[in-house]
């Protein structure tokens, strides 16, 4: 699976997501592609384009989603995406506790990516230290 930035952010040479996606699928029709999205609208667009997987990777990390957190209101953004897309949804971005992992799977995510919680142990250590200050 290759993940692509599916946000509305600008791309090199001003290329649009639709064009980039179709170029890849034309050249590599069997390649599985995941859309890294930051908003519901981006997820819906990626789903319509035909991405094999829709990811919540960029929620909270872009200008258009800076006020969002994936776990707000019992994962409201994830629940909305799950209810509106036909392709499998991969929960990614700030899935940093076993409880969050369990919840996104209960909600129907195809799978989840636990990134920084594993690859950057200093962040988890800091969260534990801050909790007891």
Regions found by a protein language model. Name each.
Residues 6-27, 40-45, 62-82, 98-102, ...:
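Active-site-adjacent beta->alpha loops and helix N-cap segments on the catalytic face
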Residues 1-8, 31:
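Short intrinsically disordered, low-complexity coil segments enriched in acidic
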Residues 25-35, 82-92:
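Short beta-strand/loop segments at the ligand-binding rim of alpha/beta enzyme cores
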Residues 2, 46-57:
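Conserved long hydrophobic alpha-helices within structured protein cores
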């Amino acid at each position: 699976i290759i993940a692509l930035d599916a946000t509305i952010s600008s791309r090199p040479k001003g290329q649009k997501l639709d064009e980039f996606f179709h170029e890849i699928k034309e050249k590599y029709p069997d390649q599985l592609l995941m859309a890294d999205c930051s908003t519901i609208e981006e997820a819906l667009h990626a789903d319509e384009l035909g991405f094999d997987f829709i990811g919540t990777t960029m929620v909270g990390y872009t200008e258009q989603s800076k006020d969002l957190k994936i776990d707000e209101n019992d994962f409201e953004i994830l629940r909305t995406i799950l209810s509106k897309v036909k392709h499998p949804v991969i929960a990614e971005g700030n899935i940093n506790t076993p409880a969050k992992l369990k919840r996104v799977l209960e909600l129907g995510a195809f799978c989840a990516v636990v990134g920084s919680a594993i690859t950057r142990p200093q962040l988890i250590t800091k969260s534990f230290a801050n909790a007891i200050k």
